[in-house]
Swiss-Prot record:
The gene is rpsC. This is Small ribosomal subunit protein uS3. It comes from Anaplasma phagocytophilum (strain HZ). The keyword DNA damage does not apply. The keyword Lyase does not apply. Keywords: Ribonucleoprotein, Ribosomal protein, RNA-binding, rRNA-binding. GO terms for biological process: translation. Residues 38-106 form the KH type-2 domain.
């Protein structure tokens, strides 16, 4: 039942890898909780910087954080002032030295999380859900995606009864393990209640598996 499982978790080590690159013999739960707090902090602090992914690695005496963003200039700030301030805040949270790296996302329209966040923002501004979905799908296909599917669930357009509507173009093979599928789920907080936005982006087969 490929449609019932998270496409990213299903393909770990086949197509992608984990976002937390460390191992711990003890205090594993504490470190994992720390990771969740760090991701939440980065997302909230740079909510306007189009952050697609936060990868965390750990050394014995340091925490290395790679922030993947479509707008790196917003994170760095003038002469790197903002990034130094954030470094100090994170260092206090984890009680370790912090290395912060900013990775630029070249094609933000191919990242499922950024597409979902963009659609959610439009829904919060009371844009028609059909228009928002169609625009997101078309922009993604223009950037070279082989297939995109977008689903919106909730009180769409202020309807009394919640329902799910979806829009799909191209191919999205959820049952093919070698298929490189990016997936994201975001909540839009509208005046009628929460609307769930899910996005699947198929960018092609993984070269490593094909070879």
């Amino acid at each position: 039942m490929g449609q019932k499982s998270n496409p990213i978790g299903l393909r770990l080590k086949i197509v992608g890898t984990w976002d937390s690159l460390w191992y711990a013999n003890r205090d594993y739960a504490t470190k994992l909780h720390e990771d969740l707090l760090l991701r939440s902090f980065v997302k909230k602090t740079f909510h306007h910087a189009a952050v697609s992914k936060v990868v965390i690695a750990r050394k014995v005496d340091a925490v290395i954080i790679n922030i993947h963003s479509a707008r790196p200039g917003v994170i760095i700030g003038k002469k790197g002032v903002d990034i130094d301030r954030i470094k100090q805040k994170i260092a206090k949270m984890v009680n370790h030295e912090v290395e912060l790296h900013i990775v630029e996302v070249k094609k933000p329209d191919l990242k499922a999380v950024l597409i979902a966040e963009n659609i959610a923002q439009q829904l919060e501004k009371r844009v028609s859900f059909r228009r928002a979905m169609k625009r997101g799908v078309q922009n993604c296909l223009k950037m070279g995606a082989k297939g995109v599917k977008v689903s919106c669930a909730g009180r769409l357009g202020g309807a009394e009864i919640a329902r799910t509507e979806w829009y799909k173009e191209g191919s999205v093979p959820l049952h093919t393990f070698r298929a490189n599928i990016d997936y994201s789920c975001v909540e839009a907080k509208t005046i009628y209640g929460i609307v769930g936005v899910k996005v699947w982006v198929y960018v092609g087969d993984s070269r490593a598996v094909v070879e």
